[in-house]
Amino acid sequence: MDEPLSSLDAKLRAELRLELKRIQKELGSTLLYVTHDQVEAMTMADRIGIVAEGRLMQVGTPREIYGNPANLHVAARLGQPHINLLPADLLPGGRPPSGTKTVGARTEHLDIVVGKDANAEVDWIEHLGDQNHLHIRAGNHKLVTLADPYLAIAPGDRISLTLRDPLYFDAAGQRLS
């Protein structure tokens, strides 16, 4: 199937994702599904293949690919908000292995403390009901992360960002362990 849900509205797309997955499981058949929509890939697939410029970059379960991407290209394909790709020395925390050029920091890799030892500033907050997207500036770099909607924070607030078990990549964009 080649992007069968791409022209549908969000509500119908969500309903049909569940229905297609149910039918596929019920029939016990293999379904090859092509999509650029990471939500469709993550919610419908038992296994995902990430392709770039005609090359298969990585194959695995959605959880494996999200948590252990082979390279920067793969890391940037999954996750909402998108992974923050930062210089290795921008934020404290973590233990970058030798050769680290880029740190990949997803929401779960960032600890936020308001006001204490500030190294970043909140530029904008998107209130989404059950969560907030924080748009943050650390030096000349912009980051986006999720935050509890009840976190007492406002645009202009200075915050401390610390890394917690982020992903590390070398100069060629390959994942380091």
Predicted regions, residues:
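ABC ATPase nucleotide-binding domains
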Residues: 1-73
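Secondary-structure boundary/capping residues
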Residues: 29-32, 83, 131
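C-terminal boundary and immediately downstream tail of ABC-type ATPase nucleotide-binding domains
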Residues: 67-93, 104, 162
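Non-catalytic connector elements of ABC transporters
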Residues: 81, 93-177
